[in-house]
Amino acid sequence: MLETLSRQWIVSHRMEMWLLILVAYMFQRNVNSVHMPTKAVDPEAFMNISEIIQHQGYPCEEYEVATEDGYILSVNRIPRGLVQPKKTGSRPVVLLQHGLVGGASNWISNLPNNSLGFILADAGFDVWMGNSRGNAWSRKHKTLSIDQDEFWAFSYDEMARFDLPAVINFILQKTGQEKIYYVGYSQGTTMGFIAFSTMPELAQKIKMYFALAPIATVKHAKSPGTKFLLLPDMMIKGLFGKKEFLYQTRFLRQLVIYLCGQVILDQICSNIMLLLGGFNTNNMNMSRASVYAAHTLAGTSVQNILHWSQAVNSGELRAFDWGSETKNLEKCNQPTPVRYRVRDMTVPTAMWTGGQDWLSNPEDVKMLLSEVTNLIYHKNIPEWAHVDFIWGLDAPHRMYNEIIHLMQQEETNLSQGRCEAVL
């Protein structure tokens, strides 16, 4: 019994153990050499999402949304901006959905004039930000505990099938609106492609879909992370267990903040954060590095990582393969995983892609573009890597302003009975 518990503890704390060894080494260097200069740590590194919003002077609300299968999701809202805060009447609603191992903080990690969440609020929109099941802010269930394997038996399939409908319907009920705008980043776009192509009744509730660094397939992705995903399932489970993946415990967060606060480690810290998606370091506000690092790893399930492993190996956008015909029949009514058809999605879609993006690779994007039947706009930014879409210093004038223009044009068209926004 003790041996089993010891093994479980080692598996669940493996990452903290390695980082502790690294910190011990750094402390030894401090003792034996000149003290390493440190940077002032941004207080937002220690805040939750609502606290960050309030710290920047914006109003915020936080809700819990229950899904059909019992998960309880945290949803953050910026109901209005600091520009024209007394404007009365309903505002157009936008839902922002983060990427893999991310959270709602993806949209507010930069200063207000550089964060899409704040920029949209100041442009007159009612901004909602989702948190997918299993991340740092959505770790509740009506009947299951995070200590149970069953809690972690999900992937982006369930996020698309259950999380998105629950959040979208909650927002519509709360605001009294009939439709919303949907902005997805990375895995947030994957959720959108699946949900809007398989649930036409949900797709009818979307005015326009904005896909940033879109991912449907990862056949050509050249990120080091996708090479790791080529490992057999059993090896991935052996490394990370069967429950959560890359969740920042309080200890781990403090450790990451400390490491990224060392001037000598500045470049290393940024390189680690950019390793999976490609490098464009000159486009990041490195004074915010501690905020990025503290909020980047919000976690997901190991099963979600296994689903991405299947996607890398198959080169297709398919449902999770449960490993047997019997289990697949139980979960998706056929013996083999369902292949999702993006071409069945009719929502007006605008896409922004990066030429140096290692995850949303140009070759995969090329295949995706041929599948999107109602593409109203596509822009490729040659220098951009994966995180430029949420952290890029030039994101406001190269992309965010275009998103707002398309939304405002759509609002004008709707008020005048016209059909399509044009950039």
From Swiss-Prot:
GO terms for cellular component: extracellular region. Belongs to the AB hydrolase superfamily. Lipase family. InterPro entries: AB_hydrolase_1 (IPR000073), AB_hydrolase_fold (IPR029058), Lipase_euk (IPR025483). It is an enzyme of class 3 (hydrolase). Disulfide bonds join C260-C269. The active site is at S186 (nucleophile), D357 (charge relay system), H386 (charge relay system). The keyword Hydrolase applies. GO terms for biological process: cornification; lipid catabolic process. Glycans are attached at N48. Its EC number is 3.1.1.-. The gene is LIPM. Residues 1-33 form the signal peptide. Exclusively expressed in the epidermis within the granular keratinocytes. Plays a highly specific role in the last step of keratinocyte differentiation. May have an essential function in lipid metabolism of the most differentiated epidermal layers. This is Lipase member M. GO terms for molecular function: lipoprotein lipase activity. Residues 92-392 form the AB hydrolase-1 domain. It holds the Pfam family Abhydrolase_1.
